[in-house]
Amino acid sequence: MGTLSAPPCTQRIKWKGLLLTASLLNFWNLPTTAQVTIEAEPTKVSEGKDVLLLVHNLPQNLTGYIWYKGQMRDLYHYITSYVVDGEIIIYGPAYSGRETAYSNASLLIQNVTREDAGSYTLHIIKGDDGTRGVTGRFTFTLHLETPKPSISSSNLNPRETMEAVSLTCDPETPDASYLWWMNGQSLPMTHSLKLSETNRTLFLLGVTKYTAGPYECEIRNPVSASRSDPVTLNLLPKLPKPYITINNLNPRENKDVLNFTCEPKSENYTYIWWLNGQSLPVSPRVKRPIENRILILPSVTRNETGPYQCEIRDRYGGIRSDPVTLNVLYGPDLPRIYPSFTYYRSGEVLYLSCSADSNPPAQYSWTINEKFQLPGQKLFIRHITTKHSGLYVCSVRNSATGKESSKSMTVEVSDWTVP
């Protein structure tokens, strides 16, 4: 390091006591000479070491100076200042206890950390004719020696062409640039290789054998550069997308046996079955041979239409089939007749509607006193008479299931006259 003037043995004033002084000095903001220079000794600084920001060519009639962390000259970034008259050192909010100010405006930073890297601003106050001050502002950027980087990966075992991977160069280093290398060559930019805004993260969209690596990253700043060890992705073979074959897509409820098969067959895979997005639970009604590739349902209900999926897995992951949904045939259930009124007066309107749960929809027909009236769900008589009294039956039939059902009600029509 260069020759230093010993720091004065003076009183040390907290930064709050400088509020008025700082405002006055900033008010005298006139241009000055640009011959002042700042250099770091040593030029390559490692974390945990000391560095001196050595100032050259200080002007005559120096009144004082202020050091700031960064390029913002405010109290928040204020480290320390020195006032020549009285040899007073003042510390600000950005003072960490590791900075030492010297009378020649140099600043010693001990036990340097990564947070210390970055720009520093020296604000010099110079006396002129004794009635006003002249100030100058000089900025210097401190660069630490770059650490040896390492590469972290979101997935070291991606599926070929199927999975995206992000590679990140660690650690995050201020005021440094990042470079990437693949197969020892500068990284080519293609549609499948993208860099983040800072170049610190590399995105690989669909890894192939040509983009599996090895990869290296480099951290570089004006004083040093360091490159990581190579990282190569373990490219896994692409899993074939499975599909389901089934013996009957239109089973009858509680009657037909269903056989699901997950294709393709391979001894290298394990098979998993899914129903409605949930792993199919173990149940006495569900039969699965040892290999689990075949799923047997001795019967199925209307609540088990699916969707069904099968998944093939290896030690690194799996892939699911497209969903398969059953068209379960059921019903007709016992029909319902609305409204349930049974008493009418002559001349009123009779309107009855019949419904029954059924898939496919059931066929409907009505009989009155065992005489066929008409097909359809609804029965309408505009002017009912006593002749319409009797037993009304709604019959339903599902031709797909071969099942029938019916519901009856008694209607009583009374004669009445206006008194």
Curated annotation (Swiss-Prot):
Belongs to the immunoglobulin superfamily. CEA family. Residues 35-144 form the Ig-like V-type domain. Keywords: Disulfide bond, Glycoprotein, Immunoglobulin domain, Repeat, Secreted, Signal. The gene is PSG1. One of its GO terms (biological process) is female pregnancy. It comes from Homo sapiens. GO terms for cellular component: extracellular region. Glycans are attached at N61, N104, N111, N199, N259, N268, N303. PROSITE patterns: IG_LIKE. It is found in: Secreted. Residues 1-34 form the signal peptide. This is Pregnancy-specific beta-1-glycoprotein 1. Gene3D superfamilies: Immunoglobulins. The keyword tRNA-binding does not apply. It comes from the Eukaryota. Coiled coil: none annotated. Disulfide bonds join C169-C217, C262-C310, C354-C394. Residues 149-234, 240-327, 335-410 form the Ig-like C2-type domain.
